[in-house]
Swiss-Prot record:
Pathway: Carbohydrate biosynthesis; gluconeogenesis. It comes from Pyrobaculum neutrophilum (strain DSM 2338 / JCM 9278 / NBRC 100436 / V24Sta) (Thermoproteus neutrophilus). This is Fructose-1,6-bisphosphate aldolase/phosphatase. Catalyzes two subsequent steps in gluconeogenesis: the aldol condensation of dihydroxyacetone phosphate (DHAP) and glyceraldehyde-3-phosphate (GA3P) to fructose-1,6-bisphosphate (FBP), and the dephosphorylation of FBP to fructose-6-phosphate (F6P). Mg(2+) 4 binds at residue 233. SUPFAM superfamilies: Sulfolobus fructose-1,6-bisphosphatase-like. The keyword Lyase applies.
């Protein structure tokens, strides 16, 4: 059976602030998707959150970028915004919905999208990841570890079906170019690109032996769409596992080190990506309530739900980070967060200028008047005296 798995995610209101979502939002979204399932639009679904973002996991046979599936997601997010978020005056109601009306494809309209179409195998494990308070490039390092690092994925060495390696599809989100790199031989070139996480983002991974899709990552950059800061992108990631692909445990091993990512408070700080537990997972209701974002609106967190796909139906989910094996990782992330928070507004905790241009910082800096250095150096005393007296140096004196 040929099946498509789609994850479409949006922040349509925080409760309170940017910490979490209102439970009624998840319930409304699940009811909306259940109705679509009854109409035959989708085969199955699951609704979950990480922080203040709602993810809609849907299976169907309509292929990627399908207007019916994207339209269903858009309509669901709009109704959740209008019926729940605005009624309860939730923070940032509808903030990821950057357009007024749906135009056939949800890409470029604000929500994050990760989709894969493939032939369902005799056993089809899939893992749906979602991260909050970070950007799509946050998954670059884990994806590299899963599919190109033999110290993470032993199958690259000992599984003949994986030994040929993988093909990485990398998107340059600034110049809108696509790179296709093969591992292991292109590994150094690949790292040269994806180490710049804000620009070069791994969008897809394919098995090199037969071109089978292995992973799909969302790549929408909200600030590049809106031209202003409207919240961090908060990506979603879909990974297939086992039988010629990394095992479930190898996929999860990629998150065993809480690497630094961009985002966190006001989308302006670097912090550790913490693999977090879900508060509750209810397969019967098709809802999972994810972790809250607390300290400094974070730290950045990622959740993982595992499913077995059968004839397009989702068996699960299983909270894959809900295990003592990840307790030490979480503790390490907390220690890293504590260390880097002590740097306050200084880099490298605060992001570099090019990452700050879509925040409110340029407006703050515009209020601070600089002086030409050559003029200032000639008569420093005059400038200092003017500041002491609360006076302004005349424009003609330094222009």
């Amino acid at each position: 059976m040929r099946v498509t798995v789609s994850i479409i995610k949006a922040d349509v209101g925080g409760f309170p602030g940017h910490a979490h979502v209102h439970p009624k939002m998840l319930e409304y979204a699940a009811a909306k998707l259940k109705e679509a399932q009854k109409r035959g639009v989708i085969i199955d679904y699951f609704v979950y959150n990480v922080g203040d973002d709602i993810s809609l996991l849907m299976t169907h046979t309509k292929g990627e970028d399908n207007k019916d599936i994207h339209g269903l997601a858009w309509e669901t997010f709009k109704e959740v915004t209008d019926q729940i978020a605005k009624r309860f005056k939730l923070y940032g109601a509808g903030q990821d919905l950057l357009k007024d009306a749906f135009s056939g494809n949800i890409r470029g309209m604000g929500p994050q999208v990760a989709e894969m179409e493939f032939e369902e195998r005799p056993s089809e494990p899939i893992i749906a990841f979602a991260a909050d308070k970070t950007e799509p490039g946050a998954f670059n390092l884990p994806l590299y570890k899963m599919f190109a690092d033999p110290f993470t994925t032993a199958g690259l060495v000992i599984d003949p079906s994986m030994h040929e390696g993988f093909i990485f599809e990398v998107l340059d989100v600034v110049e809108h170019k696509v790179y296709l790199l093969k591992t292991p031989e292109d590994a150094y070139s690949l790292l040269g690109l994806i180490g710049t996480t804000g620009r070069y983002i791994i969008r897809k991974v394919f098995r090199r032996a037969d071109g089978a899709p292995a992973a799909a990552n969302s790549v929408e950059r909200l600030s590049l769409i809106a031209g202003r800061y409207v919240g961090k992108d908060d990506p979603v990631l879909l990974v297939r596992a086992q039988s010629g692909l990394p095992a479930v445990g190898e996929v999860l091993e990629a998150f065993a080190h809480p690497h630094l990512v961009h985002g966190w408070m006001r989308g302006s700080h670097a912090g550790p990506l913490m693999p977090a537990r879900f508060i509750s997972v209810d397969p019967e209701r098709r809802i999972a309530i994810g972790p809250k974002m607390t300290r400094f609106d974070g730290p950045p967190k990622v959740g993982a739900l595992g499913f077995q796909l059968h004839e397009g139906y989702l068996e699960g989910g299983v909270d894959l980070f809900d295990d003592p094996a990840f307790d030490y990782v979480r503790q390490t992330a907390a220690q890293i967060a504590d260390y880097i928070r002590r740097m306050g507004p200084f880099q490298p905790h605060r992001l570099p200028p090019e990452e700050m241009e879509y925040t409110a910082l340029p407006k703050i800096l515009a209020k601070v008047k600089p002086y030409p250095a050559d003029q200032y150096e000639k008569d420093r005393k005059k400038y200092i005296e003017a500041v002491v007296k609360g006076a302004k140096v005349e424009e003609s004196q330094h222009d």
